[in-house]
């Protein structure tokens, strides 16, 4: 007999309560206000939007911090095809730097929330939680363009960690693709993602040997790569969960089976480019999860 009942699994597919959702929305609103009311930043073209599990509506009760992207658009970083120069595409440079921008965002948050409430970290600037808001990770980014030979480009975001590492992401494509898959699976994609995330926390709470490489983001991307039929063709969460684990286990036994898997944005490979996780990590985790569930 399985460890959890169908009712338990069903309850874990649901989003946070209304009161938790209100706290999340308060956090996003206050970050917007901090940026728009800042004397220096208010004169620049900046877009503030949610990203990560909050924006994708895949957060679970134990993971109710949020990521807010604060994107600068008066300049952009870019990657060009080989043998092309920025002059070929009419790109002009700006004297304003990413480092200056992150400092300016930090100052705006300190002015809004107070120095004691704001902590600068390697990848983000964290606003501490209180009774009104949840902990909020503010990620200052710039527009980023990945050019093709013909001059067309894919637009994303780029930022530099305080340790000097550049990271590019495609949060808007991630959100759009997640919505599309959710619509094509009777809203089961996001529910199954929440279920996988919740079970990871349950395993950790139970003292399970869960690798730090198995992140909430990775789990969402793994569910993204599960075929829609697994969410659509089975009638219970017990069976959908079971079949998703079987699929992920079978297709991560050999690297060749999953080497083309992408993130939800489908603009970055899931297992390429020096990721902290490997397909072997995922395969081992699926065994651990299966045994935890007592299937």
UniProtKB/Swiss-Prot annotation:
Segments of skewed composition (Polar residues): 7-19
GO biological process: defense response to virus; nucleotide metabolic process
Keyword flag Nucleotidyltransferase: yes
Region (Disordered): 1-28
Keywords: Antiviral defense, Magnesium, Metal-binding, Nucleotide metabolism, Nucleotide-binding, Nucleotidyltransferase, Transferase
Enzyme Commission number(s) from the entry: 2.7.7.-
Binding residue positions for UTP acceptor: 51, 123, 169, 276
Site (Important for uracil base recognition in acceptor pocket): 169
Gene3D superfamilies named among the record's database cross-references: Beta Polymerase, domain 2 (3.30.460.10)
InterPro entries: NT_2-5OAS_ClassI-CCAase (IPR006116), NT_sf (IPR043519)
Record's protein name: Cyclic dipyrimidine nucleotide synthase CdnE
Organism: Cecembia lonarensis (strain CCUG 58316 / KCTC 22772 / LW9)
